[in-house]
Amino acid sequence: SIISKNLTTPLPFFRAKKHMSEIVLKLVRMINTRHFDKNFNQIDFSKIKNLLPYDARLSDNFFKQIDTKYEKIIGINAFSNNSEYRGFNFFIKDWIGLARQLSLKYPKFLFILLNFSTNSIQYNIDQNANLKVFCNNKNIASLVSISQKLDFLITVDTGNLHLCDILQIPTLAFTSSLAAYRFGGGSYGGRFDKLIVKPAWQKEYRKIYEI
């Protein structure tokens, strides 16, 4: 694996403080250094979003059921296997609470809780006028479509973050310090901000519900 500590390359290099894009590009450069150096500056990374697969059927059906025209569409993604495993995520009920508070404070904005059909956790909430749940299928092209509709994304560190980064959707990510410098966004011309959470911070967080 390219992210493994045991990864070996033809030319060894120090990876501890490098962004993953730097690591990958350095490996690509090793294939043909002359060709890379001649052509790399001609790449416009802001246009990579045009190469993504796109399927609007699911998102079109979703928005057909919403009659109101909102000023902004905000996506909220609470799910990440990596964040759960490492203890960097909030409880789902707190994500729901955040979404509800935001929807009440900003009635002219549409807030969408993002989920996927194969997730073992599904939202069971009372959806109001400007708080909805979008459940994606297994098609990455459908996720691209709904992501393109967003004006802003609030998320834990997961694939949605990187997809919206490519699409240049402004994003606020709850992430670890390691993931922040290794996989931090903003490389494609968009805006990316982060809130760093420390390892095992959930131990103190859980005490709130034990009192």
Predicted segment positions?
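Catalytic machinery of carbohydrate-active enzymes
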Residues: 1-211
